[in-house]
Design a protein with these regions (language model features):
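Short polybasic amphipathic segments
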Residues: 252, 270-279
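Contiguous beta-strand/loop segments that form the cofactor/metal-binding neighborhood of enzyme cores
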Residues: 4, 189-269, 287, 298-308
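Predominantly a Rossmann-like dinucleotide-binding segment in NAD(P)-dependent oxidoreductases
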Residues: 131-212
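Conserved SAM-binding strand-loop segment of SAM-dependent methyltransferases
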Residues: 56-62
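Beta-strand-loop-alpha-helix segment that lines the small-molecule cofactor/substrate pocket
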Residues: 74, 80-132, 147
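C-terminal helix-rich "cap/oligomerization" subdomain common to oxidoreductases
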Residues: 1-4, 74-76, 233, 285, ...
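N-terminal Rossmann-like dinucleotide-binding module
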Residues: 1-54
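Active-site loop of classical SDR/Rossmann-like NAD(P)-dependent oxidoreductases
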Residues: 18, 287-298
Length: 332
C-alpha cells in the first residue's frame, strides 16, 4: 500500500449491528478513511447497506472475495467471537490491516496466533476497545496521574444489561457467547488501564493479578452473571462485574488513600461528569461528549498511513486475554 494515501479504504466482514450502527458511520465520518466494501452472506443485508450507505463501491457475498479485493487496505471484523481468529489470520494473509471487535480472540492462544500472523505479513492489528478514545477515559487517567487519590487500593468496574432477545448470538456457546466475552472484557481492560497508569503508563507495566477469585451463574452453557476479584502485588483489589440478567449498569469507582473517583457511563461517551471526593470536599469533573468510534477509526487509519503503532497496544490485548483465561478457568 502507498503510504502517501490520504485515506484508508475499509472493508467490513459481516453486516453486524455494531458495524451498521457504529463502525460504518464512523468510517464515513473519519477524515482519513472511506467505506469501500462490505461482505455479507445475506443478499438482503447487502441491499440494505447499499440503500443506507450511498456511494458504497463494492459488495461481496463472501468474506474471502472481499479479502481478494486489491483496493481494500484494512478490514473491520465484527463477526461472532468464535470467528475472530480465523478471519483475522485470513485477512493478514491477504495483506489487510485488521481492526477486530473485542474480544480479539476466545483465549490468549488465539490472540498470539493473530498477532503472529499480522506481524508475519507486515500488517497492523488492533482490538476495538472504543472507550479508550473518549474524553471520559482521558479524564480518568489525568486524575490517576495527578496523584490526588493517593495510593489506589480498590477498583470496582461493572458492565451489565438485561438481554431480552433469546435468539441472540451472545447466548450461543459455540459462537463464543457469554457475558464475560461480550461485556466483561471491558471492566477487565479498565482494571489493566488503571494498574498501568499507576505503574507509569506504559502498556502492560501494571502486570498481572497475583490471584483471582470468581463467582459465576451459568445458563444454557454460558455465563450470564459473572463477578471476579483480582488481587495485585501492590495490594490493589479490583472487583469486576458483568452480566446479561439484570438492569443496565455501566460504572466504575477508584478508591485511594486520599479520595474516591466515581465514573458513571465508564465505557460510553456522552457528555457528563466524574465525581471526585477528597476528604470532605466533593466536586464534579465535567467531560465532553466524544465521537469514540470515529476517533478509533482515525487512530488506526493514521497508524497505517504513518507506519506507527495504534493507541491501543497488542500488549494490552494479550494481557486482557490472559486474565480472562484465568477468570474463565476459575469459574468452572
Amino acid at each position: 500500500m502507498n503510504s502517501e494515501l490520504r485515506k484508508i479504504r475499509w472493508g467490513v466482514l459481516g453486516y453486524a449491528r455494531i458495524a451498521r450502527v457504529e463502525l460504518i458511520p464512523a468510517i464515513r465520518r473519519a477524515a482519513n478513511a472511506e467505506f469501500h466494501a462490505l461482505a455479507s452472506r445475506d443478499e438482503g443485508k447487502l441491499a440494505e447497506a447499499r440503500a443506507q450507505f450511498p456511494g458504497l463501491a463494492r459488495t461481496y457475498r463472501g468474506y474471502e472475495e472481499l479479502l481478494r479485493d486489491p483496493e481494500v487496505d484494512a478490514v473491520y471484523v465484527p463477526l461472532p467471537n468464535a470467528l475472530h481468529c480465523a478471519w483475522t489470520i485470513r485477512a493478514a494473509e491477504h495483506g489487510k490491516h485488521v481492526l477486530v471487535e473485542k474480544p480479539a480472540g476466545l483465549n490468549a492462544a488465539e490472540c498470539r496466533a493473530m498477532i503472529d500472523a499480522c506481524r508475519a505479513h507486515g500488517v497492523r492489528l488492533m482490538e476495538a476497545f472504543m472507550y479508550r478514545y473518549t474524553a471520559r477515559t482521558r479524564a480518568v487517567l489525568e486524575v490517576i496521574r495527578s496523584g490526588v487519590l493517593g495510593e489506589i487500593k480498590q477498583v470496582h468496574a461493572t458492565f451489565r444489561f438485561l438481554l431480552a432477545n433469546p435468539a441472540s448470538i451472545k447466548l450461543r456457546p459455540e459462537l463464543g457467547g457469554g457475558a464475560l466475552y461480550d461485556v466483561g472484557c471491558y471492566p477487565v481492560n479498565f482494571v489493566g488501564l488503571v494498574v498501568d497508569a499507576m505503574a507509569g503508563g506504559e502498556p502492560g507495566a501494571g502486570g498481572q493479578p497475583e490471584s483471582v477469585a470468581v463467582e459465576c451463574v451459568r445458563a444454557g452453557g454460558i455465563d450470564t452473571n459473572f463477578s471476579a476479584l483480582l488481587k495485585y502485588p501492590s495490594g490493589l483489589l479490583a472487583a469486576v462485574h458483568c452480566g446479561f440478567n439484570a438492569h443496565k449498569r455501566v460504572a466504575a469507582e477508584l478508591t485511594g488513600t486520599l479520595g474516591v473517583l466515581e465514573i458513571p457511563d465508564t465505557f460510553f461517551d456522552p457528555a457528563g461528569a466524574l465525581t471526585l471526593t477528597i476528604g470532605e470536599e466533593r466536586r464534579e469533573i465535567p467531560v465532553a461528549a466524544s465521537d469514540r468510534y470515529r476517533h478509533e477509526v482515525e487512530d488506526f487509519s493514521d497508524a497505517i498511513l504513518q507506519r506507527r503503532a495504534p493507541q491501543f497496544s497488542l500488549a494490552e490485548t494479550l494481557r486482557n486475554a490472559e486474565v480472562m483465561d484465568r477468570l474463565l478457568a476459575a469459574s468452572r
